[in-house]
């Protein structure tokens, strides 16, 4: 009996030890893990000195002081209004932070005039977490009240704003004092003058219920007497604000803010920088958004030109277009962060913003705005004249706090994150140099491309100043679906198996047919090749899908593609993990909403409820959003294991396509911090020796990519927008090869239209193929891929590639330097090597520049031929 007892005790001790080890591993591996913090970037502010304007022997802006100068520009400051002016030495044009004649604007009301004259506007919630509709504007609440100071920076100026209405009926006599502070002041005043101490005590009454003292009256005689008592101890305005804040009385401290804005001139650019670490909030206010430089370079009613916005591939909003009754343009950079609001519905689809840029082009200036820092928090806003003023303008705003509206007991409440995101809100305004034909969006695209090349974010495929025309076949981009999970039954039990839609051998047969059709360069994105197929298990391990073939067959396929100038990329998802993924702990490793604490998930949009968490009957469709905290564990492990598989590269399904934060209350990770982590992981994958292909291609990923698929080639047709432009393509052409969405994935395919659009955009044809018929995926999570059978699309693929190749083979490494529309429906695209391509979209012939173009055709001129 004793022996049995010992055994039981021993087993219990062993079980406790095992449980302890499991708990130790769990907490160490998940709760106490802090390795991700090493990826966060730190930034330092430039040193400042006492403000002193520069000597200006040749003043260019009357009434303004010179504060900085470069070879191209001069920066001026109005010391009375904080208005800024940039004088372009090359053209003689002057650009103001806001129009000088703002007060004469007959269309703008006083509220909008205050907005126009403000360099920054602060949107906030009050102490009850309710949004205050009218923001605090730097002109109305700082400049007009003379609450601003200047400090000099190297080649710039620092402006410090104190935004608030500090006027009080009682002056600096506090309305409220905490019990402890009242006793302290009473003792000090009595020691200095006993009669004044008695006066002080007579005019403050204790509110025992609320725990503080209140001034008996705010009448002038009482205020004078108490002020005289306070003067005996040298009471100051700083003491006044400190006492109000410490009193604990609701509303005692007036709402106010402090903000610092650095304005620096660098070569051909003006840099505006507002560090959030210098944003201070008082009176229970909680800043959730900041708008900067709303009217910088704004154009009036008599000017001609347009605003450039990063809507999909890019689009134009023409000045004075008569659309003042439509909704203003606003889009979030890199799309909306799902974790920022807790809204789980999607009522419309928008082309995402891939580039943190905007611009304004008029007859006398072309300005590109680049959001250098804080881009993950930014939205681009634009508006035309006659809506709120006589001006057309575009500007960025930044969301610094996430908030959710929660429904509780028939009511609702707003929950807002306690801390602002720590980041620099930095905008670089690049002033384009005037060309013979004036300014255009082509110049802005060139400015952005040059800027990125100088930073190392883009690397030219050919020589930087390529003049000679060379010929190189373009690639055909091919998504090949390999393993697809499908539901099967065994003895009545349901389980998931893998259906091999395209084996490695069958992929070779597809390539054979393409070669017979003349397509000799193919870049393959192989999907569903490992860890259970398309909706794969956690990618920290790599197990090839055996039904597709062996590793040697996969590597042989890669060798074959590389031999003809192509490539084989193997697809992987890092930021989204399927609900059925093995090796992933969704309840712990996923991002969470700040307000509700729920795990963040994403599926398809339910057409009835519009919720984007629908499974449509296939649970593998629903994905967890992986917390940035744990992202590096998967990327580092995957990169290490991929070195044992000899293929060209890695295709990133989501790492270059979307960006999300983590609202977990005890360990929040902002979207700005998430970007630091993602960029670090792109670097890890890049250093693995594999080439990288990205889907979507957000701008922060360009530095690491060889190829981009599903690049934005369209724009969202907002009411205020007038037309789309291939701005995205104009920036990256000649540095990264790219394609749009798979041509056979949509429902409005036209072979002729596809050819013309590819030729115009410089994008390469892209298809998605399966060897088996698409009907075999009808009852799977990929049932939206209903038109993938290669035999149905082989003729189109070869024909489209042949036509597009005949035009674009001359410009594979050249920059797209100009795009114009010389006639309705006719586009002219000029490349850096002198090649000019005309595209006629019209259903009838056209004559342009002395050339005859057939209906729905293109014409390529190489070296004038």
Residue ranges and their predicted role:
Residues 10-12, 21-468, 855:
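N-terminal accessory beta-strand-rich subdomains and adjacent acidic, glycine-rich linkers
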Residues 471-559, 564-630, 657-661:
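Aromatic-lined carbohydrate-binding/catalytic grooves of carbohydrate-active enzymes
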Residues 72, 274, 514, 758, ...:
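Conserved, mostly hydrophobic/aromatic
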Residues 447-458, 503-506, 510-513, 626-650:
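An active-site-proximal structural segment forming one wall of the substrate-binding cleft
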Residues 72, 438-442, 497-505, 548, ...:
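Soluble non-cytosolic domains of exported or imported proteins
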Residues 292, 524-526, 570, 652-654, ...:
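Conserved beta-strand positions
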């Amino acid at each position: 009996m004793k022996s049995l007892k010992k055994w039981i005790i021993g087993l219990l001790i062993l079980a406790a030890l095992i449980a302890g080890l499991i708990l130790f591993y769990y907490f160490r591996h998940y709760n106490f893990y802090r390795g991700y913090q090493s990826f966060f970037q730190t930034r330092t502010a430039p040193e400042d000195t006492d403000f002193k304007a520069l000597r200006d022997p040749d003043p260019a802006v009357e009434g303004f002081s010179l504060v900085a100068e470069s070879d191209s520009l001069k920066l001026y400051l109005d010391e009375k209004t904080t208005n800024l002016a940039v004088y372009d030495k090359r053209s003689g044009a002057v650009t103001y932070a806001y129009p000088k004649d703002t007060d004469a604007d007959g269309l703008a009301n006083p509220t909008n005039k205050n907005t126009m004259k403000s360099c920054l506007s602060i949107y906030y919630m009050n102490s009850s977490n309710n949004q205050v509709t009218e923001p605090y504007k730097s002109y109305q609440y700082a400049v007009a009240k003379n609450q601003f100071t200047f400090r000099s920076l190297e080649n710039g100026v620092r402006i410090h704003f104190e935004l608030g209405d500090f006027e009080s009926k009682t002056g600096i006599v506090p309305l409220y004092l905490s019990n402890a502070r009242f006793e302290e002041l009473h003792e000090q005043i009595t020691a200095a003058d006993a009669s004044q101490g008695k006066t002080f005590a007579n005019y403050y009454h204790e509110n025992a219920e609320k725990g503080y003292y209140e001034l008996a009256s705010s009448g002038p005689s009482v205020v004078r007497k108490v002020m005289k008592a306070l003067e005996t101890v040298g009471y100051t305005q700083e003491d006044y604000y400190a006492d109000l804040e410490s009193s604990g009385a609701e509303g005692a401290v007036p709402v106010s803010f402090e903000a610092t804005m650095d304005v620096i001139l660098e070569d051909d650019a003006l840099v505006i920088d507002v560090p959030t670490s210098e944003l201070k909030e008082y009176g229970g206010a909680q800043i959730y958004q900041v708008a900067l430089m709303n009217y910088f370079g704004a154009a009036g009613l008599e000017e001609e030109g347009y605003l450039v916005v990063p809507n999909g591939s890019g689009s134009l909003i023409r000045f004075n277009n008569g659309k003042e009754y439509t909704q203003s343009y606003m889009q979030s950079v890199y799309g909306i962060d799902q974790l920022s609001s807790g809204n789980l519905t999607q009522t419309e689809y928008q082309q995402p913003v891939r580039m943190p840029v905007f611009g304004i082009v008029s007859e006398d200036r072309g300005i590109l705005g680049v959001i250098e820092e804080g881009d993950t928090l930014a939205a681009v806003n634009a508006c035309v004249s006659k809506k709120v003023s006589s001006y057309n303008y575009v500007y960025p705003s930044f969301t610094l706090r996430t908030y959710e509206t929660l429904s509780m007991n028939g009511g609702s409440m707003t929950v807002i994150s306690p801390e602002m995101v720590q980041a620099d809100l930095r905008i670089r305004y690049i002033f384009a140099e005037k060309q013979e034909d004036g300014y255009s969006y082509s110049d802005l695209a060139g400015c952005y491309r040059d800027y990125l090349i100088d930073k190392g974010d883009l690397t030219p495929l050919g020589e930087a100043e390529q003049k000679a025309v060379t010929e190189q076949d373009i690639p055909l981009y091919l998504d090949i679906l390999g393993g697809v999970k499908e539901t099967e039954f065994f003895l009545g039990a349901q389980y998931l198996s893998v259906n091999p839609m395209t084996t490695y051998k069958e992929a070779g047969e597809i390539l054979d047919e393409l070669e017979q059709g003349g397509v000799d360069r193919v870049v393959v994105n192989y999907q569903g090749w490992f860890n259970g197929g398309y909706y794969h298990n956690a990618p920290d391990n790599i197990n090839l899908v055996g039904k597709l073939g062996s590793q040697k067959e996969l590597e042989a396929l890669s060798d074959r593609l590389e031999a003809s100038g192509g490539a084989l990329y193997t697809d992987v998802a890092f930021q989204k993990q399927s609900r059925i993924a093995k090796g992933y702990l969704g309840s712990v490793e996923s991002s969470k909403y700040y307000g509700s604490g729920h795990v963040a998930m994403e599926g398809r949009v339910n057409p009835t409820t519009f919720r984007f968490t629908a499974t449509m009957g296939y649970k593998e469709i629903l994905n967890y959003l992986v917390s940035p905290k744990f992202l590096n564990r998967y990327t580092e492990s995957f990169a290490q294991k991929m070195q044992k598989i000899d293929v060209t590269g890695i295709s990133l399904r989501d790492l270059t396509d979307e960006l999300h934060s983590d609202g977990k209350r005890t360990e929040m990770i902002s979207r700005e911090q998430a970007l630091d982590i993602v960029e670090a992981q792109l670097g890890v994958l890049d250093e693995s020796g594999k080439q990288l292909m990205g889907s979507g291609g957000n701008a922060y990923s360009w530095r690491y990519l060889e190829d981009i698929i599903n690049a934005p080639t369209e724009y969202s047709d907002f009411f205020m927008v007038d037309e789309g432009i291939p701005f995205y393509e104009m920036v990256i052409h000649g540095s990264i090869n790219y394609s749009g969405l798979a041509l056979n994935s949509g429902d409005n395919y036209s072979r002729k239209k596809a050819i013309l659009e590819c030729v115009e955009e410089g994008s390469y044809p892209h298809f998605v193929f399966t060897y088996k018929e698409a009907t075999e995926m009808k009852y799977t999570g990929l049932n939206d891929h209903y038109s993938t059978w290669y035999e149905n699309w082989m003729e189109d693929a070869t024909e489209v590639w042949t036509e597009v190749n005949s035009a674009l083979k001359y410009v594979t490494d050249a920059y797209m330097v100009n795009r114009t529309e010389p006639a309705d429906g006719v586009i002219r695209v000029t490349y850096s090597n002198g090649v000019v391509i005309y595209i006629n979209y019209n259903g009838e012939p056209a004559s342009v520049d002395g050339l005859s173009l057939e209906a729905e055709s293109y014409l390529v001129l190489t070296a004038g031929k």
